[in-house]
Each structure stands twice: as C-alpha cells, then as structure tokens.
Amino acid sequence: VAPKDWRLLRLDFSCCSRINLEACKNLYKAALDERIPFKAESLSDFAENRPDILKTVPAFYNIQISAEDASVADYTPAFLKCTGGMENMGLEKFRALLSQIAEFSETAVVGLSARGEPLKVNSLCDYIESVLSFPGLSVLVETDGTLVTETLADKILVALKNAPARAVKKSAVTWIVMLDAFSEEKYSSMRHGGNFAAAVNAVQILGRRFPSCVYPQFTRVNENEDELEKFYTFWHETDSPSGGKLIVKKYDSCCAVLPDRKPADLSPLERCPCWHLRRDMIVLCDGSVPLCQECIGEEPAGNVFEEGVQSVWNKIELSSDGTSVSKKDKCGKCDEYYTFNF
C-alpha cells in the first residue's frame, strides 16, 4: 500500500490535452526551481499544493443560454437563481464565446444548462450545432425533459452526424434528464410545473437516438430517499430506456443558504482542492461569470463579453489549500468541493 493516496487529485502528468500540458509545464519549471527530484512520488507530493499546477484552463464551461425554467425543483428555489428578467444569450454571442473557449481550452465540455432550461431558447439545435463545429468541444444538455420532442431529437441527431469527428474520446452530445423520483406522485412533490410522463418519455426519445449518452438523474434528498432504490434498480437495467445509464446526484445546500436535506454525508475525511474552482467556469446570459456555482447574486468575477474568457478565468484565484483566495468563508461552508464534473 502506498504511504499516500493521490487518486482523489486525479493528477495526470501527460501532455494529451491543454489542461495537462500547462500543468506539466508549470510543474517542470517549479520543480527545477525548487530542486524537486523527478520521481512520480516527489512530483505528486509537490504538485498537491501548487495552484498553478492544479488549476490551468477550464475543462467544463456551463453556459446559461436561457434564464427561463420549464419546471422548478423543490430543492432549488427559483429565487436563488437571481437572473430574473435577464435576456437569453443570443446565438451570435454564444458563437463568439465558443471561439474563445476553443482557443483557450482547446478541448472542453460545454454545458447549456446553467441556471435555466436550455430547451426554452429558439432552435436549441443551432446552439448544439455551433458547439459541434469545434472538434475539441462536446456538449452537455441538462433538461427537465418536458420540452423534448421527436422532431427536436431528430434535428440534433442530424447535426451530430454532420459534425466533424471529436478530437477526444468523449461523447459529442450527452443528455441529463432530471427525474428525481421513481413514481409520478413523488415527482409531483419534487418538481413544480413538471410532467412526469413527458420526462420519462424524453429519456426514451433521446435514448433511441443517442444510445449510452442519456442519463436520468435523481438528486438525493431526505424527501425522495424512499424511492432511491427503486429508481436505481429500474434505470440500472441495460434494457431500461437509458440502457443502464443513470446519475444519483448529491444535494447542494448552496453553502448552507438552504436547509440541510442530504440523507448521508459523503464528503472525504480530508478536504481536497475544489474541483469546481480548478476546472469549471459558469457563464450567465449577460456574460457575467460567478466565482463558482455557489456564488448566487454576488459580485461576478468578470464578464467574458467585455474582458475575455482567459482574463476572467485568471481572476478566479486558487489558494494553496485548494479554496478560493477571495471567498474562504464561503468555501468553509461548502461541501461541493469534492464533486467532479469533467
């Protein structure tokens, strides 16, 4: 057994991506300066507390193309979103943002669902097609499923087939359908304004066209814990509409702004550097960038349409202990630091 376990850091000293290349370059220079032996154990130990190695370029951009919702989950009240009245992100602005992302990160996952229902925009297919025009980018759509139709799914499938091959071994289009329940009764108590039958049907529609790329999602809270086993048992079967794919997501209290409703504490015994500060960037409809997903209604780190992606990203500083330089008090209340997106 190794004396120390670095697996939680997911260190990768290869140069197969921009995010790893920059980490390796920074590690090499710093190790030379500090006279660190060029051995895996020594380099891992050294890299563990180096912000310039742990945080290089974003791997996941979660973009708010729509500030509207189709339904509202019981565990994320709409008032927390603080984007009421904001206009949707226009397609031309979105495409300009993608160009910056592709240049800065080279390879990344682009989410379309930050604080809003992406299917509320006109022609979601055009947004997805724009992402897929960059070989290094793939797209994630998280939806409540109520607006998914056969026609829309067919159009997106055509866009996928016409897109250039991906530069990385990652699904070009991934779908998450928020269900949060196994029964219609429980669903109705969890999601206000939703439609259980339509959401389940969305998994079927998408699963037939995007096999192994559709994930029904269950956000685990005290109120639906009694249906977790049935949800898992059904959707985990390979003959289910999702082909056995599913996500059980932890509840987020938004740094204790919301009540603690999680049935179990899954946080590690020792705190690790925050994955979201290291790898994620959220961009709202107006181009403003929250410091992290937990910063709701606070002063943004910057605006990508005014300052550029790289400039704003560099403002989000990571300390040597893996927390935010400017928001240490908030980080101390947060238990999302160990959850990993891409």
Where are these regions (language model features)?
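Canonical Radical SAM [4Fe-4S] cluster-binding loop centered on the CxxxCxxC motif
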Residues: 60-93, 104, 292-296
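Short, acidic, Ser/Thr-enriched surface-loop or helix-capping motifs
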Residues: 283-284
